[in-house]
Amino acid sequence: MSESMFSRRDFLLGGTALAGTLLLDSFGDWRRRAEAAEGEVNLYSGRHYNTDNQIYREFTQKTGIKVNLIEGEADALLARLKSEGSRSPADVFITVDAGRLWQATQANLLRPLTQAQAPKLYQAVPANLRDPQGRWFALSKRARVIMYNRDRVNASQLSTYEDLANPKWRNQILVRSSSNVYNLSLTGEMIAADGAAKTEAWARGLVQNFARQPQGGDTPQILACAAGVGSLAIANTYYLVRLFKSKKAEEREAARKIKVFFPNQKGRGTHVNISGAGIVRTAPNPRAAQLLLEYLLSSQAQAVFARGNGEYPVLRGVSLDPILAGFGQFKESKISASVFGANNAQALQLMDRAGWK
């Protein structure tokens, strides 16, 4: 596999100065815990956010453990791990979407951790946001919501994901393709909640309500909704946060035309997907790898995830990005993220039969 598909970076002690909010806790505690760990950790990451790099530098500063980062697309990183096999230098695999983490477990790429082996990880992450065998743990959350054009829709008209198949929304719904992992995971959760037959019927109704054939990512759906191409968009909340912060005045103006609705609040709650990480089964530096995961779930790192990319933190008590907080509080679905991937294949098949391209 071509090395040009990946980006390599190292984070050394004494790197770029960091925001003061990250330096509030004791260096000594992390130093003591690092004494039994190896001196470096090799990280394969499918996340591409500068704020993550800030966290890695801070980890190195606090522990003395060097982080060697390889960035790439998640599917390419999974293929690389499979190709490298027991020779892989990777210690930690990080990616967005629970479905991709499930793929890693199916390929036997990740090491299981018991609660006795990793009490801090089990304490930090709720059961529905981690693998039942401790092979991966959520690092951040992203809610997939209904966004609506405030000039065309009243919130009282909205209720559930299931209601999006109602004919009253004919030619009004904007959403990306069925092959997108976020839509696959949403549909996978609906299979778990409603059953495959009802979910397929829902998908058929949803397709009938498309404002246009799916095209582009979440941001184009939101912008099209603001422009009146449709009235509703299915998208992750952090994409709207980015538009509010855009350097382009027209994108900020578009964001102001959009409101967020959290579906299924009287039922199971709103679908929440994750970014997550696990220790590679053949990790040459397993103690350093576990310490990195524990740091990523510390209050300091969680605050950076929340503020830097507009994601929801996994750890309780961590402040949200002010724009994200402005969308309001909501009830989250407690359906295990592990089923999103388990239902991926079935989800794609029924979406295809429904005509969701």
Curated annotation (Swiss-Prot):
GO terms for molecular function: metal ion binding. The keyword Protein transport does not apply. It is found in: Cellular thylakoid membrane. It holds the Pfam family SBP_bac_6. Keywords: Ion transport, Iron, Iron transport, Membrane, Metal-binding, Signal, Thylakoid, Transport. SUPFAM superfamilies: Periplasmic binding protein-like II (SSF53850). Residues 1-36 form the signal peptide. It is a peripheral membrane protein. Induction: By iron limitation and to a smaller extent by manganese limitation. Regulated by IdiB. May also be indirectly regulated by DpsA and Fur. One of its GO terms (biological process) is iron ion transport. GO terms for cellular component: outer membrane-bounded periplasmic space; plasma membrane-derived thylakoid membrane. Fe cation binds at residues 48-49, 182, 238-239. Predicted to be exported by the Tat system. The position of the signal peptide cleavage has not been experimentally proven. Plays an important role in protecting the acceptor side of photosystem II (PSII) against oxidative damage, especially under iron-limiting growth conditions. Belongs to the bacterial solute-binding protein 1 family. This is Iron deficiency-induced protein A. It comes from Synechococcus elongatus (strain ATCC 33912 / PCC 7942 / FACHB-805).
